[in-house]
């Protein structure tokens, strides 16, 4: 059969494999491409192709990530797989590879292990909306009761992290046997992908979300007023619409009287556009880099929050020494540095942590000296003297 022309007429969804080391994430990823390739919906990627992922840099942090794409009858998927545990932590916290959902791989031979838990917690903290469980290596377990016990254990674990443990699909698979072409295990990969199609919700497109643009620069045009430039992160803004300026000072409303892109006037700007917005009744000194323009009421300014943070190792250009609660770095949020204080660190089990070492993945409570437009899932960097020493994501807003 001729390979069907690859067309982007299906909804696009970003997913990834997560789970404990050696539970078969990469093998399963290879198995998905092998099985779908037989229907002309993927190109075969073998273990070595995926495992030899090139290094990428995201916000000054080096991350190894493999990107694989394939499609099902219903959707087009971009799938990320990371070779090492630290790569997952960095990837999920920086948002380098945005995930709309994830396949949690757990070996039936081992059951949930330390990183199984850590990845579920990370998925919760960074806002991965949905999970599907692939119970891998089921060909190696003869006793159906053992498989049932492992499934129960995973469901309880998911529920303990506020995922709907009773409802999440758990599919018994064998990545290795599927690659070897055994029909019953190939069928299980199809079953897994059906579950992914059905259980991982289609993401809302950026353009359909409420308008937000982080201000990068401000200048005044004589006789016309003040222009704020930046890249529209999401939504659409039309000439004549009211927007709100949020962050650093008290929020205030203004009307967009013009949208410019590449020196041309437009009726509207949309997600992804780099634009200049002409604002009515605003002086150049009223607004500055670090503020955002938003659909009124869609986002609020805050100073206190909790975040999940990865602290860079010395080899990654991070600090050489640990730091403690009370540490005052800069938080780089969207387009600007804001000074803040880290008031507390919390371990995975909820206990207080005194000292944080380079290379740690930790929950922290932070307080900024001035309010910034903030929401759950927002990414930030922690810097000192212009150098990135950590990456984080807002997991909770306090005030």
Swiss-Prot record:
Annotated segments matching region G1: 19-26
Enzyme class (EC, first level): hydrolase
Function statement: GTP hydrolase that promotes the GTP-dependent binding of aminoacyl-tRNA to the A-site of ribosomes during protein biosynthesis.
Cell compartments where the protein resides: Cytoplasm
Domain tr-type G residue range list: 10-204
Organism: Synechococcus sp. (strain CC9902)
Spans annotated as G3: 81-84
Record keyword Manganese present: no
Protein name: Elongation factor Tu
Enzyme Commission number, as recorded: 3.6.5.3
Phylogenetic placement of the source organism: Bacteria, Bacillati, Cyanobacteriota, Cyanophyceae, Synechococcales
């Amino acid at each position: 059969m001729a390979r069907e022309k690859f067309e982007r007429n299906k909804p696009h969804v970003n997913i990834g494999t997560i789970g404990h080391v050696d539970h078969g994430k990469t093998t399963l990823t290879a198995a998905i491409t092998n099985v779908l390739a037989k229907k002309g919906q993927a190109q075969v990627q073998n273990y070595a192709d995926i495992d030899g992922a090139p290094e990428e840099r995201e916000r000054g942090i080096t991350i190894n990530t493999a990107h694989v794409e394939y499609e099902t009858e219903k959707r087009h998927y971009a799938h990320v797989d990371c070779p090492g545990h630290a790569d997952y932590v960095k990837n999920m916290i920086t948002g380098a590879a945005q995930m709309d959902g994830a396949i949690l791989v757990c070996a039936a031979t081992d059951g949930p292990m330390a990183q199984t838990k850590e990845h579920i917690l990370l998925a919760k903290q960074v806002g991965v909306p949905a999970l599907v469980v692939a119970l891998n290596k089921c060909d190696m377990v003869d006793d159906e009761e053992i498989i049932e016990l492992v499934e129960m254990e995973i469901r309880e674990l998911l529920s303990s992290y506020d995922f709907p443990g009773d409802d999440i699909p758990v599919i018994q698979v064998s990545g290795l046997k599927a690659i070897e072409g055994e029909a019953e295990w190939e069928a299980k990969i199809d079953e897994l992908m059906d579950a992914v199609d059905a259980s991982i919700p289609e993401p809302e497109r950026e353009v359909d979300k409420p308008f937000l643009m982080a201000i990068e620069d401000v200048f005044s045009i004589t006789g016309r007023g003040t222009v704020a430039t930046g890249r529209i992160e999401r939504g659409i803004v039309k000439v004549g619409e009211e927007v709100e300026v949020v962050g650093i000072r008290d929020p205030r409303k203004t009307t967009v009287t013009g949208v410019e892109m590449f020196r041309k006037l437009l009726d509207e700007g949309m997600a992804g556009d780099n634009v200049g917005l002409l604002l009515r009744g605003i002086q150049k000194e009223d607004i500055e880099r670090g503020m955002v323009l938003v659909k009124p009421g869609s986002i609020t300014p805050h100073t206190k929050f909790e975040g999940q943070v990865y602290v860079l190792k010395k080899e990654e250009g991070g600090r050489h020494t640990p730091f403690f609660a009370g540490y005052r770095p800069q938080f780089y949020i969207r387009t600007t540095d804001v000074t803040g204080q880290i008031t507390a660190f919390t371990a995975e089990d909820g206990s207080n942590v005194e000292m944080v070492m380079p290379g740690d993945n930790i929950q922290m409570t932070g307080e900024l000296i001035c309010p910034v437009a903030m929401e759950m899932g927002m990414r930030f960097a922690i810097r000192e003297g212009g150098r990135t020493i950590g990456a984080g994501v807002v997991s909770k807003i306090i005030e």
